[in-house]
């Protein structure tokens, strides 16, 4: 049966008028009806611009010059209005909150239908139908903002498919979801694509998670061009992911370390179907050759929670009887599903919230009675979105702000800011406006503005969210450098790769309670903890189980230790 093209780019170029080079350069691409396609590439590769050309935001809402041809369902998009394109292409944005319009879930899903003057009876039928597809039918009367991250995404998806569009475009659907919600999201997208016969395009950095369900093709982009367009097995067998600065699945890295020559016949995209000609003997031999010297550290407790509970209304505890210790010089992850209480812990440490029971000790002394300002002299917090922290126009002034507010002499301010900018790799940009920086560079500015105050602890909320692998590594290697200088680092994260690769210890929160406090490898190989906290087993553990390695937990620990050494 002949495939029918639904999206066709021919010699397509897009050039923002403020930039010297085209963002998309001579793109030739055909996507067929019913396909599921993953578009991946580093930041600035042009994938978002490509997506915005498909959904009509370009050229209608942007000052950009385009040439060549783009057809959707056989129609030239430059001859269509945004409204006409929106009847064919539905977009689910990275941030669901930015898409909500209705006061209830039902109202939000019905928004498109109201615009199309659909009768109330027909509207109710359609809303009920799509709400069942996305498993949100029991929450139609709730406010969208009261839902969890995964539920919010289901609402935006329902509002997109209610109009029966043929093409669904997902912009980083996993960015704000915990691992279990992310897995459920990918499974839901797969279900809709198959059952509703939709064409699905996913833009995402987190390749391994997307490949939990089959995709037909992966399109790799770099510097405005398509550098690969083929099936997942061929991509994974090549080195194109690393060449593009995209993180390959950890089990693929393990196979390469073991000495396997990868090829598409090995069914690399799925561990369950993975075939190794020697039944894993090379993997077993490599595992036996690994040494793991656990670093023993002297216990020097810096921060301690003692029976801490917290409640907004003195009725229901958000946190219940939390106990843990963090040693000086640690890098620690705090993990758990959305709404578990992770961010509440950081807010209590900083004094934004007051614990209702228990005590928090810092260097052996209670923080009770310490003001936010006093705590801020020892403990710094970096928010997920740097734009929420930045208040000055120029980089130097932003980093200097905290010192100037404290009345530090201007000569000392200059010395400390320059030293910090050099440490953060920002000195060449010291006289630049903050607006000229990339998202990752802005993140470093916010870290610098905290670091200049010489804190003993830095708490970072989702430090790598939305970052491609190159910028992810830059931020994490930078944090490791700070850690080596004695700064204790606490990471609140959903990223299981980050937890495994960079933190020796993790604290797991579930429904307001601490359920684990041990090594990252121990946590991500413990089925009970994983299920309770909506985490996800590492693919390394699955690989070890499939090929019957002697001790799967030990394999994960040794791989992480070896990989750190290889990367450094």
Swiss-Prot record:
The EC number(s) this enzyme carries: 7.-.-.-
Stated family: Belongs to the ABC transporter superfamily.
Protein's name in the database: Putative ABC transporter ATP-binding protein CPE1583
Membrane topology: Peripheral membrane protein
GO MF annotation, one: ATP hydrolysis activity
Role of this protein: Probably part of an ABC transporter complex. Responsible for energy coupling to the transport system.
GO cellular component: ATP-binding cassette (ABC) transporter complex
Annotated source species: Clostridium perfringens (strain 13 / Type A)
């Amino acid at each position: 049966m002949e495939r029918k093209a639904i999206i066709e780019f021919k010699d397509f170029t897009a050039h923002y008028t403020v930039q010297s080079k085209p963002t998309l350069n001579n793109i030739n691409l055909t996507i067929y009806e019913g396909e599921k396609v993953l578009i991946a590439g580093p930041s600035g590769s042009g994938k978002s611009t490509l997506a915005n050309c498909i959904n009509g935001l370009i050229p209608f809402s942007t000052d950009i010059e385009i040439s060549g041809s783009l057809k959707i369902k056989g129609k030239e998009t430059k001859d269509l209005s945004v409204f006409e394109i929106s009847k064919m292409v539905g977009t689910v944005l990275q941030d669901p909150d930015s898409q909500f319009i209705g006061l209830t879930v039902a109202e939000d899903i019905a928004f498109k239908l109201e615009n199309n003057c659909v009768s109330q009876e027909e509207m109710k039928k359609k809303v009920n139908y799509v709400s069942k597809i996305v498993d949100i039918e029991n929450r139609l009367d709730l406010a969208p903002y009261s839902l969890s991250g995964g539920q919010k995404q289901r609402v935006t998806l329902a509002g997109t498919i209610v109009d029966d569009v043929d093409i669904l475009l997902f912009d980083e659907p996993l960015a704000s979801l915990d691992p279990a919600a992310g897995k459920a999201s990918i499974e839901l997208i797969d279900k809709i694509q198959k059952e509703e016969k939709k064409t699905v395009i996913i833009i995402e950095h987190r390749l391994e998670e997307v490949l939990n369900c089959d995709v037909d093709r992966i399109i790799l982009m770099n510097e405005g061009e398509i550098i690969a367009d083929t099936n997942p097995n061929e991509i994974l067998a090549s080195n194109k992911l690393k060449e593009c600065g995209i993180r390959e699945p950890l089990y693929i890295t393990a196979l390469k370390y073991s000495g396997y020559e990868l090829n598409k016949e090995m069914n690399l995209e799925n561990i369950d179907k993975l075939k190794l000609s020697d039944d894993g003997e090379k993997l077993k031999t490599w595992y036996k050759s690994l040494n793991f010297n656990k670093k023993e550290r002297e216990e020097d407790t810096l921060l301690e929670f003692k029976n801490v509970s917290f409640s907004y209304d003195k009725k229901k505890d958000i946190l219940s009887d939390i106990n843990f210790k963090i040693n000086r010089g640690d890098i620690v992850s705090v993990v758990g599903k959305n709404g578990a209480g992770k961010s509440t812990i950081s807010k209590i440490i900083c004094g934004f919230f007051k614990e209702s029971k228990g005590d928090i000790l810092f260097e052996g002394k209670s923080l009770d009675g310490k003001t936010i300002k006093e705590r801020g002299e020892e403990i710094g917090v970096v928010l997920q979105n740097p734009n929420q922290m930045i208040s000055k126009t120029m980089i130097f002034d932003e980093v200097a702000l905290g010192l100037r507010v404290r009345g530090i002499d201007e000569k000392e301010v200059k010395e400390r800011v320059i030293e910090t900018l050099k440490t953060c790799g920002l000195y060449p940009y010291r006289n630049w406006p903050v607006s000229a920086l990339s998202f990752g560079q802005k993140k470093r500015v916010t870290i610098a503005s905290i670091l200049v105050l010489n804190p003993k602890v830095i708490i970072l909320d989702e430090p790598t969210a939305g970052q491609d692998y190159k910028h992810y590594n830059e931020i994490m290697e930078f944090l490791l450098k700070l850690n080596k200088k004695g700064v204790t680092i606490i990471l609140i994260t959903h990223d299981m790769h980050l937890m495994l690769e960079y933190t020796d210890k993790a604290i797991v929160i579930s429904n307001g309670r601490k359920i684990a406090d041990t090594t990252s490898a121990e946590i991500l190989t413990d089925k009970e903890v994983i299920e309770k906290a909506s985490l996800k087993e590492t693919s390394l553990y699955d690989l070890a189980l499939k090929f019957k390695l002697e001790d799967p937990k030990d394999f994960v620990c040794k791989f992480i230790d070896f990989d750190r050494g290889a990367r450094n």
